[in-house]
Curated annotation (Swiss-Prot):
It comes from the Bacteria. One of its GO terms (cellular component) is cytosol. Keywords: DNA-binding, Transcription, Transcription regulation. Residues 33-52 bind DNA. SUPFAM superfamilies: Periplasmic binding protein-like II, Winged helix' DNA-binding domain. Transmembrane segments: none annotated. Signal peptide: none annotated. The lineage of its organism: Bacteria, Pseudomonadati, Pseudomonadota, Alphaproteobacteria, Rhodospirillales. It comes from Azospirillum brasilense. This is HTH-type transcriptional regulator GbpR. PROSITE patterns: HTH_LYSR.
Length: 342
């Protein structure tokens, strides 16, 4: 047989099969055609014909035959090396498929508003990365209107927030999680803290405020709270939708802002801020997990969603077991509509 140059896709013309690759490896391990054929549950004549037909098609001899068995030559050694690589890759592909089907690998993109990011998403991601180390997780913190649009576009698999009024809620599946308790925060040592008593809206109205843009849920809640106490909304307002910027500004001057209590409780022990003692507790309407109804989630996304839904169920059960406030003045809920909710 005369060697020749192998063209692109030579393996198609040679009709190279998976069985050929298995035979190369078996011959390398056994160096005997009979034993190699037996390991593949083939007859020796069938194995001999399979090898001979391929050598004829390739135009090169791969194995030297002798009385004691067979030995791969230089060409055969090359084919054995690549056969092992291909078979190993196929085995790994099967293992990865199993992991993907089980939700152990793949990727998931999660969106969330700030409060559940701290008290729900972070603990769940910690568990997911421990139990599914090959699962790639991306998390983004945004306002609810941005999250709803990104889930609708398929940029995110699911999100935790509130479905804005201008969004068609029928497109989404939604699981309510919890209402979001709010609080006012300022820097440690703020002059208002020297009053030594729970503060009212009247005490806070003249402060400099760091608030979300007009129309946002938290901004609307603060304004409604002030009006309910017969006080005009804050006038000296610096607008910022970024909790990081709000926190940095509060730490540097005598401004006041509004945070989810869960978030404030994370930052206050660090000295970044302190919770303002207010004379009543107040919150905003519940947030939940939402995802598109008609778009199937990947196995990895289903794994993450199931973990978050389980964690939210636990959170709701604990909330129901807690003692309820004695009157409506203890916790006020603002259910006013807002076009741009945070």
């Amino acid at each position: 047989m005369t060697p020749h140059r192998f063209p692109a896709n030579w393996f198609l013309k040679a009709r190279l099969k998976l069985r050929h690759l298995q035979l190369f490896v078996a011959l390398d391990e056994h160096r005997n055609l009979h034993r190699a054929a037996a390991s593949l549950t083939m007859s020796q004549p069938a194995a001999s014909k399979l090898l001979g037909d391929l050598e004829e098609s390739l135009g090169v001899t791969l194995f030297e035959r002798h009385g004691r068995g067979v030995e791969p030559n230089w060409y055969g050694g090359l084919m054995i090396r690549h056969a092992r690589t291909i078979l190993s890759g196929l085995q790994e592909a099967g293992e990865e498929l199993n992991d993907l089907l089980a939700g152990h690998s793949g990727s998931v993109s999660i969106g969330t508003v700030m409060a559940p990011a701290v008290e729900l998403v972070v603990p769940v991601i910690t568990t997911l990365t421990r139990d599914h180390p090959d699962l790639k997780i991306a998390v983004a913190v945004e306002t609810s209107d941005v999250l709803a649009e990104r889930v609708r576009q398929g940029v995110m698999d699911f999100a935790i927030g509130r479905l804005p009024d201008h969004v068609d809620a029928s497109c989404f599946d939604y699981q309510e999680i919890s209402s979001e308790e709010l609080c006012f925060v300022c820097r440690d040592g703020h002059p208002l803290l020297r009053l030594g008593r729970p503060l009212t809206a009247a005490d806070l109205v003249d402060a400099t405020w760091i608030l979300q843009p007009l129309g946002s849920l938290l901004r609307s809640r603060v304004e409604a709270l002030f009006r309910a106490e017969g006080v005009p909304p804050p006038r000296k307002v610096i607008e910022s939708a970024s909790p990081v910027i709000s926190l940095a500004m509060v730490a540097e001057n005598d401004s006041v802002t509004v945070f989810a209590r869960a978030l404030a409780q994370v930052f206050s022990p660090t000295g970044s801020c302190t919770i303002v003692p207010f004379h009543k507790r107040f919150s905003v309407e519940p947030y939940g997990i939402f995802w598109l109804k008609d778009r199937p989630l990947s196995p990895g996304a289903r794994t993450a969603l199931a973990a978050l839904r389980a964690a939210s169920d636990t959170k709701m059960r604990r909330a129901l077991e807690m003692p309820q406030p004695s009157s409506s003045s203890d916790i006020e809920m603002c259910m006013d509509s807002a076009n741009n909710r945070i």
